Amino acid sequence: MGYPMHYNNTQEIWDEMRKLSPKFTGATYEKIDALGGVQWPCYDESMDDKGTMFLHEGGHFATEDGRGNLLFTDYEPVKEEVDEEYPMSFCTVREVGHYSARTMTGNCRMLAKLEDEPGWVAMNPKDCEELGVAQGDLVRVRSRRGSLITRCLPTERVKPGSTNMTYQWWIGACNELTNTALDPKSKTPEYKYCACRVEKLDDQAEAEAYVQTQYALIRSKMGIEKAGANV
């Protein structure tokens, strides 16, 4: 669009944002430094406006009658239940160290040291024991729509019979497994629940070689590294 984008520091960026959004206007760098942080909305640059700790103070809401209106809807069961063929539930979650599909963070070496391909599938230790897999083992996760290879992560934070997987990965692309059934009104896909099964991979060396080869090829196609390079 030809808009000039030269900034000398992050404060200049923030100052421009403050001018464009009234709710941020009062949150100057000076005020943030003095108070240790400012919660928006903060409308006035003076120190009298210290931001808003919480909305609707005094119990008054931005509605016609000033009361908070709680809306609800009838429960609708998931479109795909677990069964003998796919006995575990599958949910996608966010990876702390990366953003969305890693378009902006996937090539940062520091973030790759936190977590990297092909991601993890979190499982209850009881399920891991029954399957005969340990932390870091490569496993195959399969649903009615596809399959992928990822690493096993035993954790008590997941209930027996359940799994979850972060959706940031290119090889461990968990949205290949998710259900595309739509909510009838919002048309939101049912990405957060489907049936799956986890399979043990007996030849870990072969699976590891596959992951590294695929990762190198992906990075080569992106113009990052030559295929076969150390990733």
Where are these regions (language model features)?
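Long, contiguous, secondary-structure-rich segments that constitute the structural scaffold
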Residues: 1-35, 106-122, 126-231
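Long, low-complexity segments enriched in small/aliphatic residues
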Residues: 10-110
